[in-house]
Amino acid sequence: MTGVQTCALPIFILLATGVFLALYYVPSQVQVTYNGSYAPLQGQRVTEAFAKTIDLSFDVRGGLLMRQMHHWACNIFVGAIVVHMARVFFTGAFRKPRELNWSIGNTLLTLAIVNGFLGYSLPDDLVSGTGLRIAYSILLAVPGVGTYLAFWIFGGNFPGEIVLSRFLILHALVIPGIILAMVGAHLFLLVRQKHTQFPGPGRTENNVVGSPMFPVFMGKTTGFFFLVAGVTALLSAFVQINPIWLFGPYDAAKISYAVQPDFYMGFLDGALRIAPAWQTVAFGHNIPWEVTFPALILPGLIFGLAYVWPALERKITGDNEIHHLLDRPSQVPIRTASGAAVLALTVVLFIASSTDVIANFLHISLNTILVVMRVLTVIVPPIAFYVTMKICQELRDVDNASRRKTPNMVSRTAEGEYVAVPAPHHEDDAHHEESPIHVPAFISETSNVDESSGTRTVER
């Protein structure tokens, strides 16, 4: 299965379950008395949005399953985009002529993260309300225009009265429409440019080897869709996610423990947790760097670097050629090491989003954990870069990364010294084979279709 399939298929699950949820959800922050079937909350004053979400979970047939499928599909969708983009980056599939598609993929990832956060905020429970409060503070931290921006989006001071209605419009209509349009553009460019491929028998820069669209590719895609839907349904049925009835309604005076955001927001939460207190005053405006840097500057640097990387690599290497064959990651050490460093940084920040759990589990002061995570944030990415660079250089120095090195055997000289000498090569001994056996190609460059394998070669 291609990465595009993996990324696109959860969209259909999100759309189907989202329509179901929209039939019952009410984005109202008006206080009502809950009288539903969930006994611990009966008689409490909650927002109508929270009450309707609880009703959807306990009083609507199949409602909880739909909620969980929607949530799990969102996580699968974002995770698939991340994995797909990592594959594209490490193999160099973003190079000319696919720079535009790379930018579209970056934009899709950004929109998916933003839309996931908007949907996560709609139930108005304690955790999502806390996330909204953090988002409001991040908007306030924008230098110069933060106050105006926060008031414009929230319709006034936090929590406001119309923010959920606005978020629902963005979450259910505006951003999904943009995502669908960009997925369509992504697929159009993919069909027009054809897919990339690793070097191999019969594969050149001027042709493309793969399965025909119909029936092979469409059959695989249909089967894979049902596989994704089945896995999502099983996860939703047996693995609980976002149990808002346990969190309760949002209350600014309450906090929660051992509750982290979805994984795609973990790096941002971790960065905010470990950022040291640091503020400056410039032109009469207070700049809270403990919020501005981890929540605005750092994500901007990461995503900005992703956008400009194709042009940056082209400028540094002077490579302006068109590429349809992929690189082995080991053949481009700088690129691979840079990607590994960024991934290491996000992993460390993701772990930092659980500082409270780590401190409690290890019985260590929270302040100590914060200091340790700050140090790791600084030293782990360079270490990851250096180690990855050395590994790639070692693999690149070998003529073929998959070739076995010539084995040695230990021999004793007449003087009693032990030395390593190359072992004798035996043609009939696979253990001493210096290079892998070439498996016959499914197709040859002179034939278009191999009926036995269903593969096809076409000119670009």
List the predicted regions and their residue ranges:
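Contiguous transmembrane helix-bundle modules in multi-pass membrane proteins
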Residues: 301-302, 309-327, 333-421
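Long, contiguous internal "core" modules enriched in hydrophobic/ aromatic residues
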Residues: 165-166, 170-174, 178-258
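Extracytosolic (periplasmic/ER-lumenal) interhelical loops and adjacent juxtamembrane/interface segments
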Residues: 23-67, 132-160, 251-280
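Transmembrane-helix bundle segments that line or gate the permeation/cavity pathway
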Residues: 11, 20-30, 72-95, 102-103, ...
